[in-house]
UniProtKB/Swiss-Prot annotation:
Subcellular location: Cell membrane
Residues passing through the membrane, by range: 16-36, 48-68, 75-95
Name of protein: UPF0702 transmembrane protein YcaP
Family the UniProt entry places it in: Belongs to the UPF0702 family.
Primary location recorded for the protein, binned into one broad class: membrane
Gene3D superfamilies: bsu07140 like domains
UniProt key word Cell membrane: yes
Gene: ycaP
Organism: Escherichia coli (strain K12)
One cellular-component annotation, GO: plasma membrane
Keywords, alphabetical: Cell membrane, Membrane, Transmembrane, Transmembrane helix
Mitochondrion found in the keyword field: no
Secretion signal, residue range per the UniProt entry: none
Lineage: Bacteria, Pseudomonadati, Pseudomonadota, Gammaproteobacteria, Enterobacterales
Membrane topology listed for this record: Multi-pass membrane protein
Amino acid sequence: MKAFDLHRMAFDKVPFDFLGEVALRSLYTFVLVFLFLKMTGRRGVRQMSLFEVLIILTLGSAAGDVAFYDDVPMVPVLIVFITLALLYRLVMWLMAHSEKLEDLLEGKPVVIIEDGELAWSKLNNSNMTEFEFFMELRLRGVEQLGQVRLAILETNGQISVYFFEDDKVKPGLLILPSDCTQRYKVVPESADYACIRCSEIIHMKAGEKQLCPRCANPEWTKASRAKRVT
């Protein structure tokens, strides 16, 4: 075998006329996956639950094999598609009649912010980092957590955000990128400060240094009172 043989790397022993069959097989599997997505009624991956993603991965694995392996017939992948479609319908019906099964397969929504305060332990137990969570909030126009009455991490990974009215906005943790905020271990002036980890708000005097009473973090940033601009 010759190393870096471009013809071997590109085609190996595959005849040129098989490439047309690969195109046909690819179109066939694309149509199957597309029909399944249409059947689920989802418009994008972010709308899918964990169970639905698992179904798609299983179908994709079968579809990938039939697309370019000449010894894999096309009818079995149709059987896989029909089986998965029936399984999907059955599981959806069962979940509609069993909340426990729905919680097992889909998971539960998690309240991450309540009354402007971050439930950092719940966030740490989720599959989302603080950086990702704060980025999602910023994309929804959130500048500081005191603007948020309730934020829920949904089972599909998206975040539902409910805001305080302007006259009810609280002092909160500023969630702008770190180069846009100042952090202190010794605070420079008397004011309300927010823990950068858990968003706990306490009043501190100039020159004061203390650990957060909620999470024992030593770093603070000045609490923001900014209201939403709509």
